[in-house]
């Protein structure tokens, strides 16, 4: 075999040199060890894993560690409820987590626990360093105390009447009824949520970290580029209000590490939780002597340290954690990347609706790579929430992965294996197309690096559309009937296979298992630098189905399995079967004879109303039938000629057009129409068409010279 390289015109476009090998340590937030992982957790772990896999593909020394957050009162109480020790409980949870993350293809180098010797060592080391420098303070505070359980009560374990609106059975620090916030000591008729006893007020000495001593450093650090801009802006509120000392101790009984020289006092879980990153990495270093712990954590380390977290724990990672590290003479994070929450079908996860989906429940029904891809299409570098729309999920995965990417291989492979003994041609049928797909590697790499995965996926799918368009125009299935065209068939299908290979290189961080199957089929290792080459005079293996379509019935079964049991189901009253409607005969003769009379001009509007509509020229780069939809065609519309900015639109033009006849045409769309959730997925705009309907519909075609992206005025 031989490799043909990207043509000279595009061979020097790389924007990131690989000559400099980076040292990178990456972490996810530590999931709390008292419950099951759900799809909200999986967003962060998938996001981080994609970024880590990309860095590894680029040849950088990259380590990915995590651990269970295994301390605190909730774990202690849960273990008591189960009749086991906290250690037994967290060990069982950890084993379950390791298996679950592995099944989602999360490629941790180490998954540890905060209840470890390593974490205890570094928690004490950091605390002692802070104490020696005068950054630990003590004072007496008053708290509610459960006399039956013999323990102080955290806010969450106090219930009572709201002091503002007098609503009963409200939380110890906030009221769900009126939204008020208050101190647990202000609650009327308080009771312990643990025992039901009436708590008493009791004094205790607590230990505090002197966060205000680090105000200048933190103020500079949050504006250093280590945080997203919106996060840094939000944190300025803390400085405006004045930083407060942070309570880092809890009284016995408590499951955690006892504070040195302070009997009966324990580190608050949020002190030792982030130190768990160090503990897990130290555990990895102890198992692999080639990794030097200090070179990653020393104050002057040249390694990169990144934390991926949810937006709800920004304060701990962006104020308390860097201040602790600074005070103990360790390095601070290179960056903290925060993401938003997951909603399902536009709403908060709900057990009653079956949308509070546990990781294992998902795995019991669906391929994890479906979720990895869908999350990737939605992820950006911002902290916006991400909606898992289950119908759009099915449509997007089936359309993009099965209908576009894998479809390229399935259209071309059989010709190569059956007629040419699996050998790819030495000829390149369309050098311009090959160069365009190969040259996209630099911009796609930039999207991965900046965590703009959604933009990267759109660029990859736009390329897939162009390759499918190329194959559709060339029609190798027609050419193969002509014995004089066999070389042309081999050339066309060889280029198709090569373009599929390049696209799978780009998708490998997202779809590692599909990439492995592709590598076996192509008899070639998919490495990042391979995007600059083509396989010529190379033998491939017999094609096997690489990916199955998502079945909506399996999605429904998953949500059914996620619903709370609400008692025995009530048998529905049996209804007579509906009669099948006769086909509707549409008569448009009057509308065609006098369109204005049949459809009079609408009510007059002001110019400002019209000016709100943003009409753009677009290029149709893909068109497909929509399963179980009588009227719809799914269009992929490019808003630029390069095809890197695309929109998905469902258009009711099936009665008038065959999808394949639309590919390559230019038309007009309403580009600023709010996305609309449809049964078959999300429609991101509207194309314009004329005519009364049914077969009498004509989409608008601009004159030659109009380019995708141009505004229609």
Swiss-Prot record:
Identification of the protein by name: Methionine--tRNA ligase
Family from the record: Belongs to the class-I aminoacyl-tRNA synthetase family. MetG type 1 subfamily.
Cofactor binding annotation: Binds 1 zinc ion per subunit.
PANTHER family per the UniProt record, alphabetical: METHIONINE--TRNA LIGASE, METHIONINE--TRNA LIGASE, CYTOPLASMIC
Summary of subunit composition and partner proteins: Homodimer.
Motif ('HIGH' region): 31-41
Organism of derivation: Colwellia psychrerythraea (strain 34H / ATCC BAA-681)
Cofactors that this protein relies on: Zn(2+)
Function, as annotated: Is required not only for elongation of protein synthesis but also for the initiation of all mRNA translation through initiator tRNA(fMet) aminoacylation.
Domain called tRNA-binding: residue spans: 609-713
Alphabetized GO MF terms: ATP binding; metal ion binding; methionine-tRNA ligase activity; tRNA binding
InterPro entries (alphabetical): aa-tRNA-synth_I_CS, Anticodon_Met, Met-tRNA-synth_bsu_C, Met-tRNA_ligase_1, Met-tRNA_synth, Methionyl/Leucyl_tRNA_Synth, MetRS_core, MetRS_Zn
UniProt-listed Enzyme Commission number(s): 6.1.1.10
Key words of the record: Aminoacyl-tRNA synthetase, ATP-binding, Cytoplasm, Ligase, Metal-binding, Nucleotide-binding, Protein biosynthesis, RNA-binding, tRNA-binding, Zinc
Keyword RNA-binding assigned: yes
Residues involved in ATP binding: 351
Magnesium among keywords: no
Subcellular location: Cytoplasm
Motif ('KMSKS' region): 348-352
Reactions performed catalytically: tRNA(Met) + L-methionine + ATP = L-methionyl-tRNA(Met) + AMP + diphosphate
Binding site for Zn(2+): 162, 165, 175, 178
Gene Ontology cellular component annotations, sorted alphabetically: cytosol
GO terms classed as biological process: methionyl-tRNA aminoacylation
Pfam family, one: Anticodon_3
Catalytic class of the enzyme: ligase
Major site of localization recorded for this protein: cytoplasm
């Amino acid at each position: 075999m031989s490799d043909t390289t990207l043509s000279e015109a595009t061979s020097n476009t790389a924007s990131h040199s690989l000559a400099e090998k980076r040292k990178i340590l990456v972490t996810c937030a530590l999931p709390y060890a008292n419950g099951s992982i759900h799809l909200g957790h999986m967003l962060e772990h998938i996001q981080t894993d994609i970024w880590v896999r990309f860095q590894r593909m680029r040849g950088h020394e990259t380590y990915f560690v995590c651990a269970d957050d295994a301390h605190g009162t909730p774990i202690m109480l849960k273990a008591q409820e189960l009749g086991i020790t906290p250690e037994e409980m967290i060990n069982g949870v950890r084993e379950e987590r390791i298996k679950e993350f592995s099944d989602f293809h999360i490629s941790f180098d180490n998954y540890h626990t905060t209840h470890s010797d390593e974490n205890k060592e570094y928690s004490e080391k950091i605390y002692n360093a802070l104490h020696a420098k005068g950054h630990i303070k003590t004072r007496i505070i008053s708290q509610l105390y459960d006399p039956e359980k013999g323990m102080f009560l955290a806010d969450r374990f106090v219930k009572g009447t709201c002091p503002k609106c007098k609503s009963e059975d409200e939380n110890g620090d906030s009221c769900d009824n009126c939204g008020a916030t208050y101190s647990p000591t202000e609650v009327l008729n308080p009771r312990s949520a643990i025992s039901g006893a009436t708590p008493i007020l009791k004094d205790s000495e607590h230990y505090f970290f002197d966060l205000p001593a680090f105000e200048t450093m933190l103020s500079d650090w949050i504006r250093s580029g280590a945080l997203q801009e919106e996060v840094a802006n939000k944190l300025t509120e803390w400085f405006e209000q004045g930083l407060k000392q942070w309570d880092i101790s809890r009284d016995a009984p408590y499951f955690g590490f006892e504070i040195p020289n302070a009997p009966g006092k324990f580190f608050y879980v949020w002190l030792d939780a982030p130190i768990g990153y160090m503990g897990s990495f130290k555990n990895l270093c102890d198992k692999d002597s080639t990794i030097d712990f200090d070179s990653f954590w020393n104050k002057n380390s040249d390694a990169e340290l990144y934390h991926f977290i949810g937006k709800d724990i920004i304060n701990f990672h962006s104020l308390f954690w860097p201040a602790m590290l600074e005070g103990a003479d360790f390095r601070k994070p290179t960056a903290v990347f925060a993401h938003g929450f997951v909603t399902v079908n536009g709403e908060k996860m709900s057990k009653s609706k079956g949308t509070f989906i546990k990781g294992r429940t998902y795995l019991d029904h669906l391929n994890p790579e479906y979720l990895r891809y869908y999350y990737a299409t939605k992820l950006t570098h911002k902290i916006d929430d991400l909606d898992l729309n289950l119908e759009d999920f099915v449509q997007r995965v089936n359309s993009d992965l099965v209908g576009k990417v894998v479809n390229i291989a399935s259209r071309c492979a059989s010709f190569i294996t059956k007629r040419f003994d699996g050998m790819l041609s030495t000829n390149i049928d369309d050098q311009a197309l090959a160069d365009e797909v190969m040259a996209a590697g630099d911009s796609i790499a930039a999207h991965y690096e900046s965590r703009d995965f959604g933009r990267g996926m759109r660029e990859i799918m736009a390329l897939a559309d162009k390759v499918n368009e190329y194959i559709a125009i060339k029609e190798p299935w027609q050419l193969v009937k002509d014995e004089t065209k066999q070389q042309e068939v081999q050339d066309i299908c060889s280029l198709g296979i090569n373009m599929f290979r390049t696209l799978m290189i780009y998708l490998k961080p997202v779809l590692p298992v599909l990439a492995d199957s592709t590598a076996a089929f192509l008899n070639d290792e998919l490495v990042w630098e391979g995007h600059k080459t083509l396989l010529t005079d190379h033998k491939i293996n017999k094609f096997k189905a690489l990916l199955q379509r998502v079945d909506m019935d399996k999605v429904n079964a998953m949500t059914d399995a996620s619903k709370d049991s609400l008692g025995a189901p009530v048998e529905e009253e049996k209804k007579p079967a509906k009669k099948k409607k006769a086909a509707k005969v549409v008569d448009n003769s009057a509308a065609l004879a006098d369109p204005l009379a049949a459809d009079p001009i609408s009510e007059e509007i002001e110019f400002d109303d019209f000016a709100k509509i943003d009409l753009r020229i677009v290029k149709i780069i893909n068109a497909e039938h929509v399963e179980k939809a009588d009227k719809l065609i799914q269009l992929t519309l490019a808003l630029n000629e390069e095809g890197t900015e695309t929109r998905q639109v469902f258009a009711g033009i099936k009665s008038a057009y065959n999808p394949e006849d639309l590919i390559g045409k230019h038309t007009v769309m309403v580009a600023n129409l709010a996305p609309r959730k449809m049964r078959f997925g999300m429609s991101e705009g509207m194309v314009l068409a004329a005519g009364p309907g049914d077969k009498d519909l004509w989409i608008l075609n601009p004159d030659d010279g109009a380019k995708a992206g141009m505004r229609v005025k």
